[in-house]
């Protein structure tokens, strides 16, 4: 078992210390033997709350999967897996979910030999049933967004999964709401419940609410003016329908904005690319359905824009929870048409906001994303990527941003001003002796 240097993990994550919720959860998980239920608002840092103690309990010398983290969707599986990898603590991990072949994941599990696996209930059951994951080595079961797992109808799959793990020692459930009763099949043993929910607080007091009135029913021009005033700060624009997302995203692109489009109708790889571009600063606007309102742990989102009003109070809380994460401050804007009003369930003071009519240039992100068609399975590391781009692409290390190395490909943020130069100079070049595809991600 590795002796964890928690301060080193904090440095890797670019944070100074755990927040109060994370400290309390960590103490209970590490020093008690009971099951644990954590109720904490969206954006409070629940992923790190369970990962920090978990990595201290994992036996890093074992090749068995020791912890399963059940999540309601692939986005949260990918995001949580990325958080653990970013900790660089020597614990191997993998994510499993629908949308790609189970055989591909089977090969990945054999190759990586993860100690922690993040996955959706159905796909985890599939791998347990085929013995791609040994059911006998799993000691810890974490169910993140437990409330959403129940709402999505995963009861039977979760029951099957829990009952198939004979060596299970601890169950850790995390939820942003206290609305759901925990079913008997979870078999919690003297659970220690930690609630950080303040029933009087619908949104963080670090979020300022604004109303932007559009004089016409079509709110595109009001949105354009609003975004111009944000400069290059990171913004999510929420809509209720996929076709509306496509329409608004197209309008913004036609007006020079650098955006990412995100909804459930896109192919898995398109969704991954959209999130990478947004999280690494290559696109400063994410236009999305409520798919982006839960499970995405992207820091430094300054603004939330409700182009369409949220369909429920719960949906509103999760949307606004994307900003003011950790100890940051954020802003949420409601764009209302002539016959629209802000929903009654929105509590707190909502200020009127009038975007400036002053002519401004469309903000362009400093970074752009390139795709490199090699990854971990090709023995390509972050260091290899940096060396290749500096030596062959003519970049300085400071002109390279976030690098996401996947199994078969890599996304890299590079200086937008140098992207065309990089593409020209690396054309036909080899990375670690292998020719590969290098192209922009738009």
PLM regions and their residue ranges:
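Conserved interdomain hinge at the start of the Helicase C-terminal
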Residues: 205-251
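Conserved helicase ATPase core of P-loop NTP-dependent helicases/translocases
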Residues: 104-108, 245-250, 258-289
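Post-DEXD/H (motif II) to motif III coupling segment of the RecA-like Helicase ATP-binding lobe
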Residues: 134-200, 346-347
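Conserved pre-motif I regulatory segment
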Residues: 1-39
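Walker A/P-loop NTP-binding motif
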Residues: 23-32, 47-62, 83-87
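Conserved segment of the helicase C-terminal RecA-like domain
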Residues: 285, 312-353
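Conserved nucleic-acid-binding Ia/Ib motif block in the N-terminal RecA-like helicase ATPase lobe
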Residues: 5, 63-129, 137-140, 250-262
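A short beta-strand element within the Helicase C-terminal
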Residues: 294-309, 331-334
């Amino acid at each position: 078992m590795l002796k964890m240097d928690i301060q080193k993990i904090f440095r890797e994550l670019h944070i100074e210390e755990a927040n109060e919720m994370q400290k309390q959860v960590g103490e209970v998980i590490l020093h008690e033997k009971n099951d644990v239920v954590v109720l904490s608002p969206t954006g409070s840092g629940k992923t790190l709350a369970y990962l920090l103690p978990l990595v201290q309990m994992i036996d890093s010398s074992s090749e068995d999967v020791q912890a399963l983290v059940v999540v309601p969707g692939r986005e949260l599986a990918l995001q949580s897996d990325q958080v653990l990898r970013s900790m660089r603590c020597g614990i191997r991990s993998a994510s499993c979910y629908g949308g790609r072949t189970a055989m591909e994941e089977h090969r990945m599990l054999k190759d990586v030999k993860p100690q922690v696996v993040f996955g959706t209930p159905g796909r985890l059951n599939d791998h347990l049933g085929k013995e791609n994951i040994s059911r006998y080595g799993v000691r810890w079961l974490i169910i993140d967004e437990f409330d959403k797992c129940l709402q999505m109808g995963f009861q039977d799959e979760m029951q099957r999964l829990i009952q198939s793990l004979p060596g299970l020692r601890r169950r850790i459930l995390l939820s942003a709401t206290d609305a759901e009763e925990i079913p008997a099949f979870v078999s919690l043993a003297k659970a220690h419940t930690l609630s950080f929910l303040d029933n009087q607080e619908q949104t963080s007091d670090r979020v300022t609410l604004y109303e932007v009135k559009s004089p016409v029913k079509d709110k595109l021009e009001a949105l354009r003016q609003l975004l111009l005033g944000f400069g290059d700060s990171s913004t999510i624009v929420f809509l209720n329908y996929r076709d509306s997302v496509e329409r608004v995203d197209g309008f913004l692109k036609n007006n020079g904005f650098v955006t990412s489009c995100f909804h459930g109708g896109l192919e898995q790889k398109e969704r991954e690319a959209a999130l990478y571009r947004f999280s690494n600063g290559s696109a400063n606007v994410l236009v999305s359905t409520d798919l982006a309102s839960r499970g995405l742990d992207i820091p430094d989102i300054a603004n939330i824009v409700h182009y369409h009003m949220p369909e429920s109070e719960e949906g509103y809380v999760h949307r606004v929870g994307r900003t003011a994460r950790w100890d940051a401050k954020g802003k949420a804007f409601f764009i209302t048409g002539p016959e629209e009003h802000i929903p009654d369930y929105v509590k707190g003071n909502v200020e009127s906001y009038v975007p400036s009519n002053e002519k401004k240039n469309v903000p362009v992100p400093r970074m752009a994303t390139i795709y490199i068609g090699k990854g971990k399975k090709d023995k390509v590391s972050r260091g290899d990527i940096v060396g290749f781009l500096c030596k062959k692409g003519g970049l300085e290390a400071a002109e390279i941003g976030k690098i996401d190395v996947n199994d078969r490909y890599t996304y890299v943020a590079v200086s937008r001003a140098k992207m065309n130069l990089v593409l020209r100079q690396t054309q036909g070049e080899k990375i670690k002796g292998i020719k590969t595809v290098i192209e922009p991600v738009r």
